[in-house]
Amino acid sequence: MRHRCRVPQLGKPADQRKALLRALTTELIRHGQIKTTKARAKAVRSEVDRMITLAKDGSLAARRRALGYMYDKPTVHALFADAPSRYKDRDGGYTRIIRTLRRRGDNAEMAVIELV
């Protein structure tokens, strides 16, 4: 039974949700910060933390797992080159979520998620 095993649904089927999280993760690591809804920012936070932890490990197996998840190969190589020195003293909490103004069209809660 799957009692209390909740994942953020984000109003999408599982395949679309996974693709969305992969795309948001790739773009956040590429650009350093992105603007999205608060629910999506909270959902992507754990995926980004997982990728940075893989990059801190630095092994070939970790690199291959990151390449299998993220959409952009040069971004993965840049992450693996940069993350071990940038986050060596930090054991998690690699992102910061800052709430911003609500979206004009549908009044959705918006946020900026950025790498610390």
Curated annotation (Swiss-Prot):
Keywords: Ribonucleoprotein, Ribosomal protein
Name of the protein this chain belongs to: Large ribosomal subunit protein bL17
HAMAP family the UniProt entry points to: Ribosomal_bL17
GO biological process: translation
Subunit text: Part of the 50S ribosomal subunit. Contacts protein L32.
Signal peptide (UniProt feature, chain positions): none
Source lineage: Bacteria, Bacillati, Cyanobacteriota, Cyanophyceae, Synechococcales
Segments forming a coiled coil: none
Family annotation (InterPro entries): Ribosomal_bL17, Ribosomal_bL17_CS, Ribosomal_bL17_sf
Organism per entry: Synechocystis sp. (strain ATCC 27184 / PCC 6803 / Kazusa)
Alphabetical list of NCBIfam families matching this protein: L17 (TIGR00059)
Cell inner membrane in keyword set: no
Similarity remark: Belongs to the bacterial ribosomal protein bL17 family.
One Gene Ontology MF term: structural constituent of ribosome
Gene Ontology, cellular component aspect: cytosolic large ribosomal subunit
Record keyword Ribosomal protein present: yes
Pfam families attached to this UniProt entry: Ribosomal_L17 (PF01196)
